Amino acid sequence: MKKAWMAMALPVLLAAPDVRAQDAASAATRAAQAELAKRLPLDDPQDFKNAVRGKLAEIAGGLITGKDGQIIWDRRAYAFLDAEEAPDTVNPSLWRQARLNAVHGLFEVVPGKIWQVRGYDISVMTIIRGKSGWIIVDPLLSEETAAAGWKLFADTVETQSGKRPIKAVIFSHSHSDHFGGVGGIVSKEEVAREKIRIIAPHGFSEEATAENVLAGGAMGRRALYMFGAILAPGPTGQVDTGLGPKLSSGTIGYMEPTETVPATGASLTIDGLAFEFLDAGGTEAPAEFVFYIPPYKALHTTEVVTHNLHNILTLRGAQVRDALHWSKVIDAMLLKWGGSAEVAMASHHWPTWGAGEVSRLLSNQRGAYRYVHDRTLFLANQGATLHELADQTAEAPVQGADFSTRSYYGTLNHGMKATYQRYFGWWDGNPANFNPPPPEQSAPKYVALAGGADKLLAAGEAAIASGDYRWAAELLNKLVFAEPANFAARSALASTYDQLGYQAESGAWRNYYLAAAASLRGAEIPASASNGQSRSFVSAIPTSVFFDALATRFDAASGSGLKGVFQFVLPDSKEAVAVVVEGGVEFPRYGVTDAAPTATITIDRRTLDDVMTGLAQFPALMQSGAIRIEGDRTAFLSWFALHPRADPRFNIVVP
């Protein structure tokens, strides 16, 4: 989950002069909350017992700061979650999940053998005792939170049992909240000097650095909404993501693995301790594994099995995941280790203890993902489209009894739509929907059809009054797209999103609705999660990926007549890229040296890293001689000017 796209996201200020406070929970919302509370065993104490089990220490106030005193993590603003009873403005099931995720500290999972640092990032860091030292699993998103978590462990455990070296670091999968903090616990120099093993799944290096580079701008913009980064914490604001509290806002780093586990899995001895690895690539992440430690009877389920139904397609955008394969990987875990594993722990949330409970967790999670897949195809093969699937489907039977399968992050609703997309694509098969006009063109016609803006607004307000918020959103969205300066319409649509957000069980859905409402009101706060990428992360981005990303920024409309070959030479990394421009397309040929380029540009890869991190700009580098241009300098400058920066603040809820 949870990646470096946040580094590209900027605060968003969509000005509106009519800033209103959020609405209170409506009667319809209060009734929906009460109905859900009645049918779920919200008073089941087992998860709360597991969440606090083995707690040894905590960071005071949950406050972590950076070198310059900037706040990286702060749980003080979330003290409202101390209340047991959910307010009317928060789904009671999500409130329960948020309170569980709010538990923070150092926890002993297997006495004297395994510990976890939880509640100081969206993810969890696990520390395992080897024969002579420590094995670290998933060192969080930010270097600052990882360092604080490691210090908490050292101050608590090592002061009692003695200081031991870090012998290995395990990256369970290719999302940055599971490796980005590695520089906070070990340096590259220490890895080389101490021969520290860094173990990751096959394909990790390519996926960890390349993912989201091409589409990072749009993903980052949507992520601000999904994670509630432009919302203040509180009962009417950001409460939780479902997967964890929120994203930390520190420095994201990277280290290259020293070894990878193949697709066939492997049995490894790490610091004298036996590990069994099972490949899980193509489930929650493209490169992923789970592992079992036989001497400790401990199963690490990574992000394949957590205490929620995960995303088949995340709201920020990604490639669709395979729910069928996901269910089969969980079944393989159940067959291989069910009945033997006495504790299951993951990269998020709290552990599950007891062989029977671990097997039950795996079985229920397997069933939940299989249900998403099979129910989608059952209905699709009877003619249902992605617009109809969710309304024709009741939740899986297990979801009413096992909180670990509930829609706290992913949902049955958009998981089925994603599965439909995986098999059938974006189109529902109806030719009326094959090439509809864009909203900016169709919306004014809907307004006219309704008899004018006042009548459409009245219809939307009537839908709000009746508690039909989905219909209200559809009506009022048309009006806002037709008349974005109509602040009565914006206010009514924001009120609609308030209620939809309050009712949402998914933390991601809640955040998205409430962020949309804040945008309509012009009430966003500066983004609370704005990670900086360290040089180690940027340097790991393959040069070929950088030039592919650059090509996506080429303005084909303005450059349709441009033709040429721009040869890049990177002396320090001994790389060459020939960029062929023709017919409105820019095609980088990595590793190719053109015989007769239009211009040759010599630039060190290290200098290119400075450009990517914002430490240097091309014009200044050309003036200083750090970039040397031979050949048609004017043609190069004309080509270079055809790469405008993407707007990280593009509109979502208005045209």
Question: Where do the PLM segments sit?
Answer:
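Divalent-metal (often Zn2+) His-rich catalytic cores of metallo-beta-lactamase-fold enzymes
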Residues: 23-37, 298, 308, 324-388, ...
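Conserved beta-strand hairpin/beta-sheet module of binuclear metal-dependent hydrolase folds
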Residues: 99-164, 289-293, 297-303
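Metallo-beta-lactamase
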Residues: 108-109, 133-144, 199, 204-382, ...
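Active-site metal-binding motif and surrounding structural segment of the metallo-beta-lactamase
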Residues: 132-133, 143-199, 262
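Alpha-helical segment of the N-proximal tetratricopeptide repeat
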Residues: 442-475
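Feature captures hydrophobic
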Residues: 468-474, 481, 485, 495-655
